[in-house]
Structure formats: C-alpha cells, structure tokens
C-alpha cells in the first residue's frame, strides 16, 4: 500500500514535469521524495496513515524546508479513523497534510485547496478586503451585514479583518455580497520555521562541521536524511555527507540523486581515499578540507574535483 502510494506520487510529479528523487533505500528519513520544477522545491513525506508521522521527523522536515527554501507536504489517505477528503488540508505537527487526489489537483491541474480541517469541523480563510469592498459597493453598513448574517457587528468586523470561519458562514457571506469570498490555501508557503546553525554535534563529525564553519561556510546539521548537513556560502548550497559508514558510495549515490533533483552541489568528506566522485557527489579527504582556508577555496576544490575523471 505504501509502495503503491509512493509510486503514484512520483508519477504525478513526473506528469507535471518535476525532477524527482525518492529515498526508498534509506532509513531513517524525514522525507521520502524530493522534487523540483523551476523555483519550486518540494519535500514530500508519504504515509498511508498520517498518524504515524513522528514529531521529530516533522521538526526535521520543517528545518530542511527553511534551509533548502523548499515546501513540505505530507501525503496520506487516512488520518486517525477517517479517510482524508479531496480538497481539504489537514495539519500534523504544523505540516500540511493532503490526500493523493488533492495532490494531483494541486500539482497537475493547478487547483489550490480552499478548505482546512481543524477541531470542530471544516474552515476557510476569508478574503477580508474583497468582503469589505463588496459590502461598501452594495451600500451595506456593518450593522446591515450583521443583521443579514444573524451575527454581531463585532463578528462582521472580524470577518473584514481576516478571521477564519466555517464553510456554511462563508456560503452565507458569498450569497449576500454576490462574489467569491474565500482565499485559497497556499501549500507552497504553509510552514514558517526558524533554524539555527549553532546546533552542537560532538566527536569527529563535530570537528568537520567546525572546520567548515572556520573557513566561512554556514553549516546546518541534519538528521534523518542521506546527508549530514547543508553547507552554504553566498549562493552556493552544498549537501554535505561526512558519516563514515560502511557503504559510503551507496549513500553518496543517493545523496547525488537528491542534489541533482534540487540543483545543488554535493560533497562527501571522508577519512580515507574513495573514488574521486560518484555521480554528482565529490569526495573530499579530511586532510584536503583542512588544507583550504576559505569558503571560496573549498567551492573551487569541489569544482576542480568535479571536472576530474
């Protein structure tokens, strides 16, 4: 069931001409698919029942969203005891959750959802400016509008300040003003996250991070991904691996697929000599890292190694 859902998501993305990389080969992971089209980068977590999303995975996904300037989306079919409904956005640990049909509508058809689920039912975001302009154009006072809706003047003022409301109330407002009164939900800008590069990492990995920072890179450690940090220097973004695992080339290959999908550089820092590169991933010996004195020199080293056979 999970594999079929992953396959369907990949097909939808390919139909919409996204570059796609899936992470089915790695665990643990905070996202299953990364995709890019033009300036849009998506980090996608796929779960049949979204109850199984862990809070630490959600936090890591939000952090990566900020670092990579990406948009996180969780895709599933069930939430708690119910099936997810088409056209409705749910929320889990601050991440947007939608079903496969809603994802298809959004990615392929360009149809944004308008309804979100929250305790108490389904709600919509009101277009406050449009409501106020329509009321004034019709010559209705706030009191007139309140009387027609059966609510207080204060409530109408809240609607015109942008408060959210139920579907039934939104329908009444639209009937009165004679125009569309709700806003689409922007799935690409759903999440706001704060990040800090000052996260402490101990041992040999911490030493590598410290050296990258010494030469002038901003370094954001990452968990639950096939890379260990995102290193940044001005406009250069480098997915960076440095865990000395047994199958280092296999991990680097997966890292390369992700970097190619999002059009980023990729480097793997190692204790001992490996191949010069695997796909788009450049291997850098620790001693080479310690021999460079600036971020600019490090980027030059990567480009130089990338051109070598």
Curated annotation (Swiss-Prot):
Transcription in keyword set: yes
InterPro entries: Arc_TR_HTH, Cro/C1-type_HTH, Lambda_DNA-bd_dom_sf
Highest taxon above the source species: Archaea
Name of the featured protein: Putative HTH-type transcriptional regulatory protein AF_1787
Residue intervals of the HTH cro/C1-type domain: 131-185
GO molecular function, one term: DNA binding
Key words of the record: DNA-binding, Transcription, Transcription regulation
UniProt DNA-binding region: 142-161
UniProt KW Lipid metabolism keyword: no
Pfam families: HTH_3
PROSITE patterns referenced in this protein's UniProt entry, alphabetically: HTH_CROC1 (PS50943)
